[in-house]
Amino acid sequence: MKILVYGNQKFSDYDTFTRAVVVAIDNANGATTDDSRLDIYTAGPYKINQFTAEFVNKTEGFFKQKGIKSRFYRVLKNDVVENFDKYDIDTVVYLSTKNDRSEIFDTVISEAENNNIPVSVYKV
């Protein structure tokens, strides 16, 4: 399964990040034929990239016990928008603060919706 995680500069709640990723994994489970891999693509900003690295490092042993190889990749948001089909994403997670309204016009969310990819938006 492949999950894209990204957000805005002000997002800084690790607990919400963890919940969002776990829900995305649960929802994407069985969506692809290769459930022996968990690829999390992180398109930033820096704090969300850090959260992704921490999450994968902390859960690596658990996933390994389940026979799942977990990895994360840092990607550029613009590259994801331009080459969305190349990434073969199963679900998209957007993390923001409550006063951020940019997801209404976000290009990644629009691209995901155009490709019938589930999108989850979490605001703190």
What is the meaning of each model-derived region?
Residues 1-16:
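Glycine-rich phosphate-binding "P-loop"
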